[in-house]
Amino acid sequence: YYSIWDWFNPLWPEKDQPTYRGKPCNEVTLNNYIEKVMYPQFKELVLKYEPALIFSDGDWWMDDEKWQTKPLLAWLFNNAPNKDEVVINDRWGKVRKKHGGYYTTEYGSGFSDPSILWEENRGIGKSFGYNRFEQFDDYNSTELLIYMLCDIVSRGGNFLLDIGPTADGRIPVVMQDRLINMGKWLNVNGEAIFGTRRWKRDCQWSEGVIVEYTKQEFHKGIPDPIIEMARYPRKGQARKEC
């Protein structure tokens, strides 16, 4: 995981960032940050650890031209020691679902196109980091998380499930419970998940309608699209679409 945006770096102060009171980004300090922090830090991580996968993040507010990620990725795929094996996602400056080794969705429903390599990313609750204000009901049940895993894998996707440790590194008990019970399920049923491939078309036992919600709707509490897909069909209306 590498965030190209560093909210608290003194070389790119908050008042110069594009999220500050609706003001345009200060490109002088941005370029200084990219040259002295982002580029050297990224290259140091690659040279020191030679990662097989890089999950970039923090690109939301600016495009790849302002982030200057094209030259950075050109270096990665032409000069880095891991250039022949490294895989990247699609978060490099407003290029999601356009460019990358694989595409990502976040608290979404993934993709149905079999030609796309993709991954659904989400937390066990509604937050990626530790959120002390989350209530027990904000966390998905083990049953629903297993359903999500099966649904995503059956459509050819990868499931990245995030946990949020506390400030001292502890994993909250409710998250431990979900991980342990998912592990128990996988110990029995793992052969149906690991090393499998998607079928030539999706299969559903319900209507299986994928609804795309806006970011604003999601933050206002609109139901999770995968949860909506998980509902059992009404009596007499089940059908198998294979």
Stretches found by the model and what they are:
Residues 1-242:
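Mature catalytic domains of secreted/periplasmic carbohydrate-active enzymes
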